Swiss-Prot record:
UniProt superkingdom: Bacteria
BP GO annotations: CTP biosynthetic process; GTP biosynthetic process; UTP biosynthetic process
Family membership noted in the UniProt record: Belongs to the NDK family.
Key word rRNA-binding present: no
InterPro entries according to UniProt: NDK-like_dom, NDK-like_dom_sf, Nucleoside_diP_kinase, Nucleoside_diP_kinase_AS
Source organism (scientific name): Rhodopseudomonas palustris (strain BisB5)
Gene name as annotated: ndk
Record protein name field: Nucleoside diphosphate kinase
GO cellular component, one term: cytoplasm
EC annotation from Swiss-Prot or TrEMBL: 2.7.4.6
Length: 140
């Protein structure tokens, strides 16, 4: 399996509770390397662009409001099969359905405030990384 990169966000519920280090520990324990990372406060425009795929969903407004409610940590993760591996480490979107040992099982507050984002495919990973990082900010 090839080395891949995926895009990750530690969401406002994680920065608010000061658990970004605890989440990073789970990421690293899974064998993923944090090859880029910065703390930002997303603008409404950035959040709307990022989640444009969900703009017709009933929770879109709530999701954008949440993502701009506080700072986030955006990251690029690198490793073998990184996209699927990180989805496994994150756990199910709804923390009540997330498996033991996953980030969302351990830390998520609700289906909306669920601590982390991870890309779902190589195409979306490339688009999401490029939205937030220049090439020279990623150091593998
Ligand atoms: P995932 O983040 O697991 O890929 P989705 O892409 O389906 O999940 O949804 C994007 C984000 O929208 C979720 O992580 C969550 O923050 C939010 N969300 C999804 N479903 C709901 C819902 N039913 N109610 C509120 N927020 C939701
Ligand atoms: Mg998704």
């Amino acid at each position: 399996m090839a080395i891949q990169r995926t895009f990750s966000i530690l969401k406002p519920d994680a920065t608010e509770r000061n658990i970004t280090g605890a989440i990073n520990a789970l990421i690293e324990k899974a064998g993923l390397r944090i090859v880029a990372q910065k703390r930002i406060h997303m603008t409404r425009g950035q959040a709307e662009t990022f989640y444009a795929v969900h703009k017709e969903r009933p929770f879109f407004g709530e999701l954008v409001d949440f993502m701009i409610s506080g700072p986030v940590v955006v990251q690029v993760l690198e490793g073998e099969n990184a996209i699927a591996k990180y989805r496994d480490v994150m756990g199910a979107t709804d923390p009540s359905k997330a498996a033991d040992g996953t980030i969302r099982k351990a830390h998520a507050k609700s289906i909306g405030e669920n601590s982390v984002h991870g890309s779902d495919a190589p195409e979306t990973a490339a688009i999401e990384i490029a939205q937030f990082f220049a090439g020279n900010e990623i150091v593998g």
